[in-house]
Amino acid sequence: MENTIGENDTLSAIVAAAVHADLLILLSDIDGLYDGDPHRDPTAKLIPVVPSIDAHILALGGGSGSGLGTGGMATKLKAAQIVTEVGCQMVIANGSKPALLYDIVGGKPVGTRFLAKEK
């Protein structure tokens, strides 16, 4: 079976929801969710915390024809929707910095943290 871009993001969210995980970490080629495309816009700012996922946040992932999305961010946001709905937090962080995993698990501000809805 051939994987398509984004399949792993969705699959990991489904598994995290099924096992009632407290935290899902998705690693990417950028530090997290930005208010613009950091590959094209040097003034794009990292969004450290997303309390809830709304149309504005989804548009940052490339939805609604915004053109701001960076490779697979839309699927990461879909994964965030899945897990936050069931009470699991999610973090998007830079996968080229594996030592950050300790900081993420320790609750330090790394990447973009999506807050879980109350169960």
Region locations from a protein language model:
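C-terminal catalytic "cap/lid" subdomain
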Residues: 1-119
